From Swiss-Prot:
Subunit description: Monomer.
Gene that encodes the chain: LAP1
Sorted UniProt keywords: Aminopeptidase, Disulfide bond, Glycoprotein, Hydrolase, Metal-binding, Protease, Secreted, Signal, Virulence, Zinc
Disulfide bridge map: C310-C314
Lineage, opening ranks: Eukaryota, Fungi, Dikarya, Ascomycota, Pezizomycotina
Protein's organism: Arthroderma benhamiae (strain ATCC MYA-4681 / CBS 112371)
Function: Extracellular aminopeptidase which contributes to pathogenicity.
Protein name: Probable leucine aminopeptidase 1
Glycosylation (residues): N196, N288
Length: 373
């Protein structure tokens, strides 16, 4: 994720719809999209320099020829009232800060989780093992629940856990699993406790909570549920782009996607004398799904919301949106008060508040159950 900033980009951006773009073959280059239709070929170091300046982007180098970003999304009717309070509250009661502390301590102990590094592969393998253990513990595999690796052409794989429902229409919760030290991406220490170890373990704990409901475990929910952990977000939303492009190509229907990127830092709000709140992202999201998310928060969470904007391609919900799937994003705080330690070796567990992370987990359980059950 990013700290929002406005940049004056000096290099000429080229329209996707324009003439062919020459590639400098003297060094590996990547095609990035900085805004709708504005692209540029850059080296990997130039990508990191943009990120250091607060500029996010899609890396569309491997995008299918002829791909067109969605300009409209199907009209989906979302619930306008809470229908499953008893079930959700029972699941929420099982959520554990201790589980999240244990998981995040381990996840942030990898030297880094860079998507091209062996550490990124190792951390993804460990994380998938925890997801599999949650499914096994709930007995959900007997009813078709599973977790699979979504492979890419780099070391770290994405992870997709599926709990089948009566309909193939999918309710998705996602978080990116990779981390980065922007000064030294491949070898630098990048614990990534908040960005985005916090989101990764938050949705893992929410998965455990959801798997306490036997209607869901036994495949009797109305819709299918998926939990995603994306590889390569920091390099241009690579893993989530690959997954949602695949879903688009294969005709999968997604009812809604909720993204969780950074869920644990509250000091910025506290230092400003503000009430600790969720940051509701209002740009590059689906307005109707976001309205539904607000309703879920008001029912199941104990903190209020603040509207905030995070810019183009700021996190993985943008990949769903780009492929025509409705998405929403809830951050730990307003964007201008996010954790200042992100992308450094100082992004450690010491700065995080697990009560705040539990609030995010409560949101996820409510979102999934009210939309899928």
């Amino acid at each position: 994720m990013k700290l929002l900033s406005v940049l004056a980009l000096s290099a000429t951006a080229t329209s996707v719809l324009g003439a062919s773009i020459p590639v400098d073959t003297r060094a590996e280059k990547f095609l990035i999209e900085l805004a709708p239709g504005e692209t540029r070929w850059v080296t990997e170091e130039e990508k990191w320099e943009l990120k250091r300046k607060g500029q996010d982007f899609f890396d569309i180098t491997d995008e299918e020829v002829g791909f067109t970003a969605a300009v409209a999304q199907p009209a989906i009717a979302y619930p306008t009232s809470i229908r499953h309070a008893d079930a959700v509250n029972a699941m929420i009661a099982t959520l554990s800060k201790e589980n999240m502390q244990r998981d995040l301590t381990k996840l942030s102990s990898f030297h880094n989780r860079y998507y091209k590094a062996d550490f990124g592969k190792q951390s993804a393998t460990w994380l998938q093992e925890q997801v599999q253990a949650a499914i096994n513990s709930a007995g959900a595999s007997r009813y078709g629940a599973k977790v699979v690796s979504f492979r890419h052409n780099w070391a770290q794989h994405s992870i997709v856990a599926t709990i089948p429902g009566r309909s193939p229409e999918i309710v998705v919760v996602g978080a990116h699993q990779d981390s980065i030290n922007q000064r030294s991406p491949m070898t630098g220490r990048a614990p990534g406790a908040d960005d985005n170890g916090s989101g990764s373990v938050t949705i893992l704990e929410a998965l455990r909570g959801v798997l306490q409901d036997q209607t869901i475990v036994q495949g009797k929910a109305a819709n299918t549920i998926e939990f995603h952990w994306y590889a390569g977000e920091e390099a241009g939303l690579l893993g989530s782009q690959a997954i949602f492009a695949n879903y688009k190509q294969t005709g999968k229907k997604v009812k809604g996607m909720l993204n969780q990127d950074m869920t644990g830092y509250i000091k910025g709000m506290v230092d400003k004398g503000l009430k600790v709140s969720f940051g509701i992202i209002t740009d590059n999201v689906n307005a109707n799904l976001t309205k539904f998310v607000r309703m879920v928060i008001s029912k199941y969470c104990s903190i209020p919301t603040i509207d905030t904007r995070c810019g183009y391609a700021c996190s993985d919900h943008a990949s769903a949106n780009r492929n025509g799937y409705p998405s929403a994003m809830v951050a730990e705080s307003p964007i201008d008060l996010l954790d200042p330690h992100l992308h450094t070796d100082s992004d450690t567990i010491d700065y995080l508040d697990f009560d705040h992370m539990i609030e995010h987990a409560k949101l996820i359980v409510g979102f999934v159950t009210e939309l899928a059950k």
